[in-house]
Structures are given as structure tokens and as C-alpha cells.
Amino acid sequence: YGGLGYGGLGYGGLGYGGLGGGCGRGFSGGGLPVATASAAPTGLGVASENRYEGTVGVSGNLPFLGTADVAGEFPTAGIGEIFYGCGNGDVGITREGGLGYGAGYGGGYG
């Protein structure tokens, strides 16, 4: 529209689709950086060449999130499984740092 419309320098100034700031990276699927640190030991390992018969249980508290791994072969006449639980299943972000909202609206809404 003569260089002043939606695709030019903005909508009556420097807004829509032109040089205006705001509503940018926060709404474009950018990353969410997360850094965690554990005060507790970072691993738990149970390793043995022995044969376990019956139920083997390991319990305790792990920080935030954890993993479980089984290596080896299970005999076809028996069963093998991992029952792994972490809290009540709710994982949430309790605090965020950083810049917060975008830079604001463009200067050309008028």
C-alpha cells in the first residue's frame, strides 16, 4: 500500500510486519533452557553376577527425575520387570528466571 501498509514500514508507523518489536521469540516456538543440579548422589547401581530368586526391591528418594536400566537376559520360564515410580507423577516448574515478557508492542499502532 504505497510502502505504508502491512508489508511496508508498518501500519501507520513501524508496527505490523515492519520493524516493530515484541511478540517475537516468545511465541515462535523458541527453546526453554533448563539447568538442574542435584544435591544427592547422581546414580544408584545394583550389579551382580548372582541369580536372584523372588522379589528384589530397592527404595529411596531420588532428586527430581530419574531413570532405570536393566541389562542382561531374563530366562523364558520366569518374569522380569521394573516398577518405577516418582512422586505422584506431577512434574512442574516452580521458578523461572530470565527476561520474562517480550520487548513490548511496536511503535506504529497509531
UniProtKB/Swiss-Prot annotation:
The keyword Repeat applies. Residues 28-96 are annotated as: Central domain. Keywords: Repeat. Residues 1-27 are annotated as: Left arm. Sequence repeats lie at residues 1-4, 5-9, 10-14, 15-19. InterPro entries: Chorion. Residues 1-19 are annotated as: 4 X 5 AA tandem repeats of G-Y-G-G-L. It comes from the Eukaryota. GO terms for molecular function: structural constituent of egg chorion. Residues 97-110 are annotated as: Right arm (Gly-rich tandem repeats). GO terms for cellular component: egg chorion. GO terms for biological process: chorion-containing eggshell formation. Belongs to the chorion protein family. This protein is one of many from the eggshell of the silk moth. This is Chorion class B protein M2410.
